[in-house]
Amino acid sequence: MDYKDTLLLPKTTFPMRGNLPQNEPKKYKKWFSEHVYERMKQNRVGNDKFNLHDGPPYANGHIHIGHALNKILKDMIVKYYYFQGFDVRYTPGWDCHGLPIEQQVEKKIGREKKESLPKSKVRELCRQHAAKFIEIQKEEFQNLGVIGDWDNPYKTMDFEFEANIYKALAEIAKKGLLVERSKPVFWCMHDKTALAEAEVEYEDKEDYSIYVAFPLSNEAKSKLGIDNASIVIWTTTPWTLPANMGIALNPEEKYVLSEDGKIVAKELYENLKEAEVVSGEIVKEFDASELENLKAINPLNGRESVIILGEHVTMDGGTGCVHTAPGHGEEDYRVWLKYGFSEILQPVDDEGKYSNLIVTEKLLPEEFKGMHIFEANPKILDLLGDNLVKVSKFTHSYPHCWRCHNPVIFRATKQFFIAMDKEVNGDTLRHRALSEIEKVEFTPKTGKNRLSTMVANRPDWCISRQRDWGVPIAFFRNKDTGELIIDDEIIENVYEIFKVKGADAWYDLSIEELLPESKKEMASKLEKVNDILDVWFDSGSTWFAVLKNGPYDAGEYPANMYLEGSDQHRGWFQSSLLVSTSIEERAPYKSILTHGFTVDEKGEKMSKSKGNVVAPQEVSKKFGTEILRLWVATSDYSGDIKISDGILKQVAEQYRKIRNTIRFLLANVNDLEEIKLTNPSMIDRWILARSKEVFDEVVALFGKYDFSKAFNILNNFIVTELSAIYMDVCKDRLYCEPLNSEKRRNSQSTMAVIVKELISLLAPVLTYTMDEAVEHAPKVIKEDAKDVFDFVYTPLTAVENPIDEEILEIRRRFFEIVDRLKKEKVIKDTLELAIETNYDKLLVDEMADFFVVSLISDNIEGETLDEFHISDEQFVVKIKRSPLHKCPRCWRYLAEEEGALCERCEKAING
């Protein structure tokens, strides 16, 4: 007789294979069409709140694997809180203004045409470009399974948003923190605009290394009592020498005169002698203070160069005498101001060419006018003649524009700054920002020191840009005096106009049209500021425009979390902190989480030229988005994160095990109508206790955002305990026990309890798969849930664990022997075996099930196949063949006769 039809075999419509690339897009489309996010909000009304404020990606180009990592991590955290019962908010957004979009428009229509168009037309083309890529990226982000307010995302180019960026600027101006002055800033000669520190990256560049002798003035030589002397400077920027105004020395150092008449730092003398910059012995020594305020002569143009002292002068290279051009260097400028000097020479125009200033101030011969500074370098060396002591070339790390990748320079121009050290109401922005950082929770903790160090050492924030596509610094200036007009009524009027017409109104409307009725008579006396805001000010104001003032349901200010790549310590985290602290005197976030960058499996940066780029769109097509999400969850994001086909295949294998576990659990509760743990067996209590321990630990780790450690623990539990032991052990009772036997129903109830919480636990990461599981789950699991978003995680009830570590160790040792017996073809199946032992712990009901053998007893006849001792040799475990016969229904060796059913199966069939 074939007994297969008498078995209660598992049944489920949940497929073994996910066919993720084909099925995920349909599921995601369904979620968004059914407004799942709105239902999530309704499901948690009145609960504790959590909001993650989205750092806006740039609306240009397709998303890359770094975007995917970032958005998936955000989504996992938001969903973790949701499935823990929190009322969550996540409003995605886009950064829409700025140079890269302007460059793309220029690339498309040509530079000449762009420069011939009115500003409003250029801005319209930029707006169209940004809008196109917002739609492209929106679909790509949604295809990652990211849930949020996609129906009402924030865009920094929306009219009301632009108005709020302007309002944030006005608030800062009213507090007196907006200052305008000439100051050296990073300047991109290619794009003709100022740059912030965060917009500069360092690349290798070949430059000159020159030593130049500045002869001392006659007065200086007379004061020092010497006949012939020059002070020697070292520089890598010959083009700045015409703008030299001083030479800085270290106040704590000694300076010496060589036999050949050159003054350098004493500490560097031997090195310079070896390099043939100086020669002979030291003939005289000076304190730096003896040289202070003396004059040297610039050999290029005969202008005086004053000797000053500065702490910034170091002894780690050069001559200890620093060429100082305050129009072309941040430190040069600072030390120059300390001395109270007001004049600054800055003879370079927007394009990096010498201006007419070199003629009017007699800095260089007239032939240099209009010459690019880099082209001028070798010609300047020729002009130096014998004063050029030494010249060579070398490669060093040099600042470049992060967008066009051309070298940048320091150039003093009139710009708007947010003042870091200006005292307002007895405090400075720098001090307030540093105090606020102390209140923020950082993951990883190293982020706090990193952000603090950057804020402590940063210069004033240059927020003005000389471009077209951005929010204008929409203030008026008095034509006659140049004074900036910061007037509440005018600001409010411009704000209201921007809300309706956008910031384009600044360019489209006349001054009179922009003024309120009561101020229109002022129009003829005013002019507009033409600069636009740094895009970092845009993104730094998102808390103001989204959480405080805008038409968004994005959660409260300050946000519970900001989450971005570690490069944002110098970018968005800092700009947001400075804008928020300027206006509200507090940080805009309660916590900051940072992640590393994506690299290939060798740890190398991805690039098209190397052919190692992994595109998220391709991963989704080949493996499925769930594999990408599981890759994020199982990776340690605190450092760089490796990704490759090989790594994704390993993740896919892990996914398969999780999916099959869920499938097994669902299939084996298909006929369960009610979860009822009336008298759970020892094995049920063991897995419930272990599940409680593991799930609690996983939830705690999720709460610390340590997903990789949590998944390592959870995956290990699923594979080695839930699947390899419990599910395997329970097959007999599930398939062979009578339908309603207590033993079977208790195990089914145990599985139902576990799978319900496992679904809620895995849902933040494997949302698609868990939703699919709910779709195919029986009523006892699903209850009234429409989908996975109607689930909420509930901690399991504590149960005493009846199986200790010693029993598990005995089981491990037993299965090592079983594996050997199978390899040696002594047995095919553990059910052929019986265990004879004198150890009371093993002589209990169900232990045979736990060891997957037919019988455990203290006395079993027959040959011993192997044995081992436990508990200091006191007890023995003997592995024998079962003396009984194989039951043709359950395959256990418990039948009294060959071909007969065992007692349990006889009852199951015949009652």
Curated annotation (Swiss-Prot):
Its cofactor is Zn(2+). This is Isoleucine--tRNA ligase. It comes from Nautilia profundicola (strain ATCC BAA-1463 / DSM 18972 / AmH). Its EC number is 6.1.1.5. GO terms for molecular function: aminoacyl-tRNA deacylase activity; ATP binding; isoleucine-tRNA ligase activity; tRNA binding; zinc ion binding. Binds 1 zinc ion per subunit. Catalyzes the attachment of isoleucine to tRNA(Ile). As IleRS can inadvertently accommodate and process structurally similar amino acids such as valine, to avoid such errors it has two additional distinct tRNA(Ile)-dependent editing activities. One activity is designated as 'pretransfer' editing and involves the hydrolysis of activated Val-AMP. The other activity is designated 'posttransfer' editing and involves deacylation of mischarged Val-tRNA(Ile). The keyword Transmembrane does not apply. It catalyses: tRNA(Ile) + L-isoleucine + ATP = L-isoleucyl-tRNA(Ile) + AMP + diphosphate. Pfam families: Anticodon_1, tRNA-synt_1. ATP binds at residue 608. L-isoleucyl-5'-AMP binds at residue 564. Belongs to the class-I aminoacyl-tRNA synthetase family. IleS type 1 subfamily. GO terms for cellular component: cytosol. InterPro entries: aa-tRNA-synth_I_CS (IPR001412), aa-tRNA-synth_Ia (IPR002300), Anticodon_Ile_BEm (IPR033708), Ile-tRNA-ligase (IPR002301), Ile-tRNA-ligase_type1 (IPR023585), Ile-tRNA_ligase (IPR050081), M/V/L/I-tRNA-synth_anticd-bd (IPR013155), Rossmann-like_a/b/a_fold (IPR014729). Its main location: cytoplasm. A motif ('HIGH' region) lies at residues 57-67. GO terms for biological process: isoleucyl-tRNA aminoacylation. Zn(2+) binds at residues 887, 890, 902, 905. Monomer. IleRS has two distinct active sites: one for aminoacylation and one for editing. The misactivated valine is translocated from the active site to the editing site, which sterically excludes the correctly activated isoleucine. The single editing site contains two valyl binding pockets, one specific for each substrate (Val-AMP or Val-tRNA(Ile)). It is found in: Cytoplasm. A motif ('KMSKS' region) lies at residues 605-609.
